[in-house]
From Swiss-Prot:
Cystine connections: C115-C131
Protein known as: C-type natriuretic peptide 1
Keywords tagged on the record: Cleavage on pair of basic residues, Disulfide bond, Hormone, Secreted, Signal, Vasoactive
InterPro entries: C_natriurtcpep (IPR002406), Natr_peptide (IPR000663), Natr_peptide_CS (IPR030480)
Described function: Exhibits natriuretic and vasodepressant activity. Has cGMP-stimulating activity. May help to regulate body fluid homeostasis in a variety of aquatic environments.
Organism: Oryzias latipes (Japanese rice fish)
Family: Belongs to the natriuretic peptide family.
C-alpha cells in the first residue's frame, strides 16, 4: 500500500512545475488565400437541406408558377429547374430518392421471420433460423 503512494509522490516531484512554451500556429498567407478561393468557388453549391426542400416542394412550385406569381418571391435555388442538371446534382438527387424509398420498406419488414416465423432462443434473443 505504501509503494503506490511513494510512486505517485515521486512522479509528482519529477514533473516540471514550469509551463513550457508552445509556438502559436499562424496560418500562412497561402493557406488563407487557398481557403478563400475554395469558399468562393464552392459557396453556391446546394446543401442536402436545399436538395430535400427542392425535391419536396417541386410540384407546389410548378402550380404556383403557372398561376402567374412573380418569380422574385421564390428562393435562390428555384432557378435550378431551368438549368440543365449536372451529373453531381443527378447523383445526389437519385441517392436521396433511393434513401427515402428504401426507408419505409426496412421499417415495415421488422424482424427477419424466416420460414417458421420468429424463434425465441433459450437465452431470450430473437433469431429467424427456421429453415
Amino acid at each position: 500500500m505504501l509503494c503506490p503512494v511513494l510512486l505517485c509522490a515521486t512522479l509528482l516531484l519529477l514533473t516540471p512545475f514550469e509551463v513550457t512554451e508552445a509556438r502559436a500556429l499562424h496560418p500562412s498567407a497561402d493557406a488563407v488565400q487557398f481557403v478563400e478561393q475554395f469558399l468562393d468557388r464552392y459557396n453556391d453549391l446546394l446543401t442536402l437541406d436545399d436538395l430535400e426542400n427542392l425535391l419536396n416542394t417541386q410540384p407546389e412550385e410548378q402550380s404556383t408558377l403557372s398561376s402567374g406569381v412573380k418569380t422574385a418571391e421564390y428562393p435562390k435555388w428555384a432557378d435550378l429547374q431551368t438549368q440543365p442538371e449536372t451529373p453531381w446534382f443527378r447523383l445526389l438527387k437519385g441517392a436521396l430518392t433511393n434513401q427515402k424509398r428504401a426507408e419505409p420498406d426496412r421499417s415495415r419488414r421488422g424482424w427477419n421471420r424466416g420460414c417458421f416465423g420468429l424463434k425465441l432462443d433459450r437465452i431470450g434473443s430473437m433469431s429467424g433460423l427456421g429453415c
